[in-house]
Design a protein with these regions (language model features):
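Cysteine/selenocysteine-centered motifs that mediate thiol-based redox chemistry or coordinate metal-sulfur cofactors
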Residues: 329-330, 336-345, 475-512, 516-518
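C-terminal binding/interaction regions
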Residues: 347-374, 380, 494, 499-542
C-alpha cells in the first residue's frame, strides 16, 4: 500500500441499476464498512445482509417531492467534498458533526433508455437525475481523498480493495474521477440532445444574425455540439492494419445501421462498416422500389431496381462483375433463395438486408461461412452528417435527394425532344443513383440499372471517359451506352464531357446546369439531337 492509499471505511451507495451490487455487499460485510444508502438501494443492500444507514437518518430530513430530493444536503455533500488532507476541512467536519466518505458508488437514472422506450415527455423528465450527478461530480472533484465508482464493471475491483484494506492510490482515484466526469458529461450531452430536439427555440425569441452569416436551424446546428457516443466494439484495426479503430453507438438510437444484427460470418471490420453503410443508404434512395447495390471502397460497382430482389441483384452485379469481387451487397427488400443462390458463387465481404427468407439465410450461413450477414430493421434515418477536420468539425444536413430540382417534374428541357416514359424512368434512376457516387461522377444507366460508372476523378472528362469505358469494355462486346441515359452530379464546365457521352451513343442526359458555358454544352446536345435536362440541383459527394 502506497502513502497515497486511503482505506475504505465509509461508503455512500446510490444506484439505479442494482445488477452486480451483491459483489460490493459481500465486501462491505467482510470488511465491516459503514454504508450509507438511499431508498431502493438501501433496501437491496439490507436484503443482502449489509448493515445500512438510510440517507434520511444522516440528513435528518426525509426524501421528498416523489424522490426528487434525497441527497441534496450538506450532511451528504460536505462528507463527499471534504479534502481530508486539509486540516481545516477536517476540523469543520468535526465542528458540524459530519463524517467523511471514502467511497461513493453511483449510477444514474436511465435517461437514454427512457428516451429509446418512447416514453412521453413527463416520464422522460423524471429520469433526468439531479442528485446523482451532483454526488458523482463532488466525489470526482475530491479525488484527493474519495474514490468514485460509476461503472458496474469496476465493482469487483472495488470489492477486492475493500476486503484487503488497501483502498485506492491517488493515481487510481484520479483515473476513476476521470471516468466519472466522462460519465456525467455524456449524461448531460444526451439530455441536451433530447432537449434540442423536443424544446426548440420558440418563435417569440428573436436572435440577430451576424452580418455575412446565414440563418441556421438551431435544432440541427446548435451553438455548441454536445452529442455523445458509447464505445460498443473495439475493432481489429482501422482502415489499414497499423490504425486503431472502435465502433461507437448513439445512446438515443438503437435501430440504425450501427446496431445491425449479425447473423453469420466473421466480425465486422472498419472498412466493412464504411462500405456496408454506404450500400445500405444507397438502396434506400430508391424505396419503395426494390433495389440492390454492390459497393466497394465506398463507391458503387453497380446499382439496380428490379421486379424482384434477385433480378435487382443480377442487374447490379452485371454492371461491373470484376469490381464486385470482394464487395458489399445491400438490398432494401427481403433476400430470397433465388438471390442467395446468385450471391453464392461470388466472393462477397458483407450482405445487408432488412430480412432473409429462412432457406436463403441457411444457404448463406452454411455455404458462405465467412460472409458477414447483417439484418437491419429500419431504413437510414440520419439527417445530419459530421466530418472531423484538424481542430474542428464540419456539420451538414444529409443529402436526401429531396431538393426541388430532384423532382423530375421541375426539370428544364434544354435540348432535344422530351424523353419518352422509359427514358425518363432511366434518367430518374440515374439521377438518384449518382448521389452515392464519389465526385466527379458520371453515371450511365439502362433499364433502371447502372451500366457504366465514372467516379472519383478530378475532372469531368475523365469521369465521362471512365463511365463509357466501363460500360463497353465490361459488356462482352455489347454496346451498353447506345440508347442509354446518363447523369452528371455537377454541371459540365465545357462541352467536352457531354460530347464523350453523346459520341458513345447516349440519347438523354440529366445534369444540374449552372456553368458559364452552359450554352456551349446545350448546343452540343442540340446538334446531336440528344435530349438534355437541367435540374438546378447539384449532388457532389466527397
Amino acid at each position: 500500500m502506497t502513502t497515497t492509499n486511503r482505506p475504505i471505511r465509509r461508503a455512500l451507495v446510490s444506484v439505479f441499476h442494482k445488477e452486480g451490487i451483491e459483489v460490493l455487499a459481500e465486501a462491505f460485510i467482510k470488511a465491516g464498512t459503514e454504508v450509507v444508502s438511499t431508498g431502493s438501494t438501501a433496501k437491496r443492500l439490507a436484503e443482502l445482509g449489509v448493515k445500512v444507514t438510510e440517507v434520511s437518518e444522516v440528513t435528518g430530513f426525509p426524501e421528498c417531492l416523489d424522490g426528487r430530493v434525497k441527497t441534496l444536503d450538506p450532511h451528504i455533500h460536505a462528507g463527499i467534498l471534504a479534502d481530508m488532507t486539509n486540516p481545516d476541512h477536517a476540523s469543520q467536519l468535526e465542528k458540524f458533526g459530519i463524517k467523511p466518505f471514502d467511497l461513493v458508488v453511483v449510477n444514474l437514472y436511465p435517461f437514454a433508455d427512457t428516451v429509446r422506450s418512447g416514453a412521453d415527455e413527463a416520464a422522460t423528465i423524471e429520469k433526468i437525475d439531479i442528485g446523482g450527478p451532483s454526488m458523482v461530480r463532488g466525489a470526482a472533484k475530491n479525488s484527493a481523498t474519495v474514490a468514485i465508482i460509476t461503472d458496474p464493471n469496476d465493482y469487483a475491483l472495488v470489492a477486492s480493495r475493500i476486503e484487503n484494506g488497501e483502498g485506492f492510490s491517488l493515481d487510481e482515484r484520479r483515473w476513476l474521477a476521470g471516468k466519472a466526469f466522462a460519465h456525467t458529461a455524456a449524461y448531460d450531452a444526451t439530455i441536451n440532445e433530447w432537449t434540442a430536439k423536443h424544446w426548440p427555440k420558440p418563435a417569440s425569441i428573436e436572435q440577430p444574425v451576424s452580418e455575412g452569416e446565414t440563418e441556421v436551424n438551431e435544432a440541427k446546428f446548435p451553438a455548441t455540439f454536445t452529442r455523445t457516443w458509447d464505445r460498443a466494439h473495439v475493432l481489429r484495426y482501422g482502415e489499414n492494419p497499423h490504425q486503431q479503430a472502435s465502433l461507437y453507438l448513439d445512446p438515443l438510437n438503437q435501430n440504425g445501421f450501427a446496431h445491425a444484427e449479425q447473423l453469420g460470418g466473421k466480425p465486422m471490420s472498419y472498412n466493412n462498416y464504411v462500405d456496408a453503410d454506404a450500400a445500405w443508404r444507397a438502396v434506400w434512395d430508391f424505396a419503395p422500389q426494390i433495389a440492390v447495390a454492390v459497393v466497394k471502397h465506398n463507391n458503387p460497382c453497380g446499382l439496380a431496381i428490379g421486379a424482384t430482389v434477385a433480378e435487382a441483384h443480377k442487374k447490379a452485379h452485371a454492371c461491373d462483375p470484376m469490381s464486385a469481387y470482394g464487395g458489399v451487397i445491400a438490398a432494401n427488400s427481403k433476400v430470397t433463395m433465388e438471390m442467395a443462390e446468385s450471391v453464392r458463387p461470388i466472393f462477397t465481404e458483407v450482405i445487408v438486408a432488412p430480412d432473409y427468407d429462412a432457406d436463403a439465410l441457411e444457404l448463406l450461413q452454411t455455404k458462405k461461412k465467412n460472409l458477414r450477414i447483417l439484418k437491419v430493421s429500419e431504413p437510414p434515418k440520419t439527417k445530419t452528417q459530421f466530418r472531423q477536420i484538424d481542430g474542428g468539425l464540419l456539420v451538414q444536413s444529409t443529402d436526401l435527394i429531396d431538393a426541388p430540382g430532384d423532382d423530375p417534374n421541375a426539370w428544364k428541357l434544354v435540348s432535344g425532344e422530351p424523353a419518352d416514359a422509359e427514358t425518363v424512368r432511366d434518367l430518374v434512376f440515374a439521377w438518384r443513383a449518382i448521389r452515392c457516387v464519389k465526385s466527379n461522377a458520371i453515371l450511365i444507366a439502362h433499364d433502371q440499372a447502372t451500366v457504366g460508372i465514372g467516379m472519383g476523378q478530378v475532372n469531368r472528362v475523365d469521369s465521362a471517359n471512365l463511365s463509357v469505358e466501363r460500360a463497353n469494355t465490361l459488356a462482352d462486346g455489347a454496346n451498353r451506352t447506345k440508347g442509354a441515359a446518363a447523369a452528371s452530379d455537377a454541371f459540365f464546365p465545357f462541352a467536352d464531357g457531354a460530347e464523350i457521352l453523346i459520341n458513345a451513343g447516349v440519347k438523354a442526359i440529366v445534369q444540374p446546369g449552372g456553368s458559364i458555358r452552359d450554352e456551349e454544352v446545350f448546343e452540343a446536345a442540340r446538334k446531336a439531337g440528344v435530349t438534355m435536362y437541367v435540374t438546378g440541383t447539384r449532388h457532389f459527394f466527397h
